[in-house]
Amino acid sequence: MFVGTSLLALAALAHDVLALPNAAQSPSAIRIRKSTATNTTGVFGPDSTIWAEDTPYFPVADYVAPPSNCEIDQLERHGARYPKKSPTKKIKSALKKLQKVTITETSMQFISNFTYDLGEDDLTPYGALQSYDAGVEAYQRYTSLVEANGLPFVRASSSQRVVDSAGNWTAGFAAASNSVYTPVLSVIISEDGNDTLNDGSCAALSDSDSPGDQEAAWIDIYTVNITDYLNAGAPGAGLDNTDTQYLIELCPFVTVANSERSEWCDLFSSLDAFPGFEYYGDLDKYYGTGWGQGDLGPAQGIGYTNELLARLTNTAVNDSTSTDTTLDSNPATFPLNRTFYADFTHDDLLIAVYSAMGLFPTPALNYSSPDDQETSAWRVSEMTPFAARMVVERMSCSDESGSGDGEYVRVLVNQAVQPMPSCGSDDNDLCALDAFVESQAFARNIGMLPRYTGQHWAE
């Protein structure tokens, strides 16, 4: 049995204050950017792969098995959830404006009879199932690494939605093994203190549900025509562009609440809203805990990265950022002898870890237009969808593998193997373990050394 309960989706302030475009300017055509995903099948229709961080999980690429023996570290986001408290108020406010007037546009008629009955923060039944299915998949994929005395070691950040996701994952893992192997959630890390599975350790980053400068500027560009359409179809509603942004959120949230595509999705798909909506999510994460936040955002991922390095090298954790030294110094709460580790977290922490590790290197996003970002690696829909997962595989390879004798590491995000030029990855996108550890200088030196930018080390 699996359970459902809540979430968190943080947004942080931008590192630099940028000159904003004129909000009244006419929007340029918003093109659908090219995806690098080899699998773009959406669970709830083709556009459900571009709902930013509200995207239901989909494998970005087909999984390719590693050459041989592995140790697995998996960092997974909780499953799909209901809106948080603050967005809920804003969604209801915008919806009230529409429902107090007579709607004349045919495509919007359903709104008059729409009842908002979503919960707050908790996992939806679909979100609970996502984590359960992930546990089933993990057992099926890595069966050879599991034995009675070597079950996955599971941790979770203390938010209830994250704890429940971890429990659902262990239930799926056990069910797939016919209850031969029954991993348990061993450690719940309090978000009130040092927690490497949560990005709340830095007071200088705002915990905000409102758009930052870059995102707000983009809202006033991409929603202009959509807002005009909605106001024309509901005379007197008086919607503004921010209202429109929150109304678009109803598509993914109602969909994952009911496990079927919402009428809101069809409305906003007909208005070509989702390419712009996706780019809003990209900006939010990029200037939150991602590359656009200088070193402050990625620094939130240092603690977890150092824990990962400790596991890969079977050495004590060396960190003075967000680790809980009491937990990490105790073999019962931070063992170093397991072949499978599974940690459960939030989307913003995943973004911080990606950025700290040098994954998805991306120059500054143009917050007035996505047109020059068509081939950008920074696509939140493919990085942190609901139930997103980063898997780090440590393996022993022989000369026959094509990578030479020795220990290697590869990193997968939602099944897509990540290129890692910072550690000299080979044609199989494998890095020698020593080279991988050396490449993580930003984390190993507690953010005092530069991060890899994708082409060189940042100054």
For the regions a protein language model found, what residue spans apply to each?
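Signature for phosphate-centric chemistry
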Residues: L20-F153, S157-Y341, T345-E459
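Fungal secretory targeting signals
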Residues: M1-Q25
